[in-house]
């Protein structure tokens, strides 16, 4: 799948600043900039520009993805001079590249199954007269569900690599020191597939056995401070260290240059760092949705830098109308930025709340008091230095 974005298209993206896209089906039909009534039934999306320039965050929701009631949602946080263009291109193309790779795997599996069935039929016919007791069908090596999850895992890994390659080929897009994070969730029936790279995050709200609401982090923040990430970068010749005025924030630097100082260890784009350990490979995990799982929140680091997982979950629970949940999360993050870091510029903040059951907020309301108490405790935490940009 080749893509080509003209300079006019990129300028249009910049001028309209359409950070949110809603797609009704996998053919790409849908709307931009607003949530439709259909979107409100399953998710809430919101993005707000910070004080650092154009909004480099992008958000998408696709319904009818992979199956009739399938859902894809994603949050992308661009960085660098062309970050806003890259995050929007990835938002617009990555979901359908994942679907294309998955469909290719399905076709390959179907062809292999046809060959196996033909071979098995020939073997069975040849041996039936010699051993009538050997008629039992061969047992599958894995369940259909496990096979489906593996197909999605492979599709995500392949699509992320292909997307990174397509960015490199864009003649009107400088990806040398610009790129984007990506955190995506695919819901297929009761199965969730989460693909993540960079420092955006996915958090699940679930009820404990004792009736308390819990925030479960589903992804790892791919920062250079993570030992495994730092080791890979150093093996590839990259350098990892923090600046004197922010020693706790590890950044990635080229071998012989004090640039670019990237605050994440994985990304799409950032081509100058690809040979030095900054990889486009997502971490793909899966989870079977249970009756205790209520909703999940995908958000950029503009949210997570100032709000804890527990606070975000409690904010969603305390929102009377679920279509306003993501806006409530973003507005709370902006308020926290202003209160906690009054001399710093507020970062772009974006969130998607994906509701896993129709009764999500009604059930969660019963536990919101406990979650709110946890949030109040978190808010009393001492102030810290401003997070990395």
Swiss-Prot record:
Extent of Low complexity compositional bias: 121-145
PPM-type phosphatase domain location: 42-356
Cofactor(s) the protein requires to work: Mg(2+); Mn(2+)
One example GO MF annotation: protein serine/threonine phosphatase activity
Swiss-Prot/TrEMBL keywords: Hydrolase, Magnesium, Manganese, Metal-binding, Protein phosphatase
Comment on bound cofactor: Binds 2 magnesium or manganese ions per subunit.
Annotated Mn(2+) 2 binding sites: 77, 301, 347
InterPro entries noted in UniProt: PP2C, PPM-type-like_dom_sf, PPM-type_phosphatase-like_dom
Binding-site list for Mn(2+) 1: 77-78
GO biological process, one term: regulation of intracellular signal transduction
EC top class named in words: hydrolase
Enzyme Commission number: 3.1.3.16
A Pfam family that the UniProt record links to this protein: PP2C
Superkingdom in the source lineage: Eukaryota
Region (Disordered): 119-145
Catalytic activity: O-phospho-L-seryl-[protein] + H2O = L-seryl-[protein] + phosphate; O-phospho-L-threonyl-[protein] + H2O = L-threonyl-[protein] + phosphate
Similarity annotation: Belongs to the PP2C family.
Name recorded for this polypeptide: Probable protein phosphatase 2C 12
Organism: Oryza sativa subsp. japonica (Rice)
């Amino acid at each position: 799948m080749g893509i080509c974005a003209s300079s006019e298209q990129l300028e249009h993206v910049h001028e309209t600043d359409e950070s949110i896209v809603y797609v009704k089906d996998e053919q790409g039909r849908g709307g931009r900039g607003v949530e439709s009534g259909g979107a409100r039934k399953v998710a809430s999306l919101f993005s707000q520009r910070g004080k650092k320039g154009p909004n480099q965050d992008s958000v998408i929701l696709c319904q009818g993805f992979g199956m009739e009631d399938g859902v894809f949602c994603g949050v992308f946080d661009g960085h660098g001079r062309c970050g806003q263009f890259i995050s929007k291109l990835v938002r617009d193309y990555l979901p359908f590249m994942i679907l294309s790779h998955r469909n290719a795997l399905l076709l390959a599996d179907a062809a292999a199954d046809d060959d196996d069935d033909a071979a098995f039929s020939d073997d069975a016919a040849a041996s039936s007269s010699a051993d009538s007791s050997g008629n039992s069908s061969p047992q599958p090596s894995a369940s259909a569900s496990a096979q489906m999850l593996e197909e999605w895992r492979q599709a995500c890994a392949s699509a992320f690599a292909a997307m990174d390659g397509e960015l490199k080929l864009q003649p009107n897009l400088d990806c040398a020191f610009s790129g984007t994070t990506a955190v995506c969730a695919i819901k297929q029936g009761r199965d969730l597939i989460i693909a993540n790279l960079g420092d955006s995050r996915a958090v699940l709200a679930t009820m404990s056995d004792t009736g308390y609401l819990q925030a479960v982090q589903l992804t790892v923040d791919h920062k250079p401070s993570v030992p495994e990430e730092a080791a890979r970068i150093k093996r590839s010749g990259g350098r990892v260290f923090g600046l004197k005025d922010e020693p706790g924030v590890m950044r990635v630097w080229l071998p012989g240059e004090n640039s670019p100082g990237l605050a994440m260890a994985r990304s799409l784009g950032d081509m100058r760092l690809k040979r030095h350990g900054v990889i486009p490979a997502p971490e793909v995990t899966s989870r079977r949705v249970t009756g205790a799982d209520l909703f999940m929140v995908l958000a950029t680091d503009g949210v997570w830098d100032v709000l804890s997982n527990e606070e975000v979950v409690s904010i969603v629970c305390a929102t009377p109308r679920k279509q306003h949940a993501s806006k409530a999360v973003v507005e709370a993050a902006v308020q926290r930025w202003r209160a906690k870091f009054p001399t710093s510029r507020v970062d772009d903040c974006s969130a998607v709340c994906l509701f896993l059951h129709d009764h999500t907020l009604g059930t969660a309301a019963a536990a919101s008091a406990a979650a709110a108490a946890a949030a109040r405790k978190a808010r009393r935490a001492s102030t810290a230095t401003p997070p990395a940009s």
